[in-house]
Swiss-Prot record:
Additional remark text: This bacteria makes magnetosomes having a pseudo-hexagonal prismatic crystal of magnetite (Fe(3)O(4)).
GO CC terms: magnetosome membrane
Keyword line: Biomineralization, Iron, Magnetosome, Membrane, Metal-binding, Transmembrane, Transmembrane helix
Name of the molecule in the record: Magnetosome protein MamC
Renumbered residue ranges of the record's region Magnetite interacting component (MIC) binds magnetite: 37-57
Source organism: Magnetococcus marinus (strain ATCC BAA-1437 / JCM 17883 / MC-1)
Chain's role: Probably helps control the size of magnetite crystals; in vitro synthesis of magnetite yields larger and more well-developed magnetite crystals in the presence of purified MamC. Binds Fe(3+). The lumenal domain probably binds magnetite crystals, affecting crystal size and shape. Purified MamC self-assembles into micelles in the presence of ferric chloride hexahydrate (FeCl(3).6H(2)O); both oxygen and iron are present in the proteinaceous micelles. Whether this is relevant in vivo is unknown.
Chief site of localization: membrane
Length: 133
């Protein structure tokens, strides 16, 4: 009986390539978060959440990157350039979306605790709100 080759199996489809990217991205994030946890910089919960977000983001970016490289085709340089550019854009968009979602959740939590929202505070740099002598 032949041994099962996971990498070969996953590389046969674009979603499989995305899973492989998620495994690699999640592994890198876990290694980073374990060091941060040992230094006392983050909690276990924060490490788990960040590792999950990074794994999903890397998997998504890898999937979109593999698809784009396949659509564009071309030679090695064009395919690699396309894959790299699309992966960077995909991961950037994922991270931006996560930051926005976390900010909304923090604002909602702040409101539930009876605090003001950031939108309630006047903008100190708004020229219309400055007093004129």
């Amino acid at each position: 009986m032949a041994a099962f080759n996971l990498a070969l199996y996953l590389s046969k489809s674009i979603p499989g390539v995305g899973v492989l990217g998620g495994v690699i991205g999640g592994s890198a994030a876990l290694a980073k978060n374990l060091k941060a946890k040992q230094r006392g910089e983050i909690t276990t919960e924060e490490a788990v959440i960040d590792t999950g977000k990074e794994a999903l983001g890397a998997g998504l970016a890898t999937t979109v990157s593999a698809y784009a490289a396949g659509v564009v085709g071309g030679g090695l340089v064009v395919s690699l350039g396309t894959a790299f550019a699309v992966a960077v854009a995909g991961k950037y968009a994922w991270d931006y979306g996560m930051e926005q979602m976390e900010a909304k959740l923090q604002e909602k939590k702040h409101q539930e605790q009876g605090g003001q929202t950031y939108g309630d505070n006047p903008d100190p740099f708004d020229p219309q709100e400055l007093e004129t002598p």
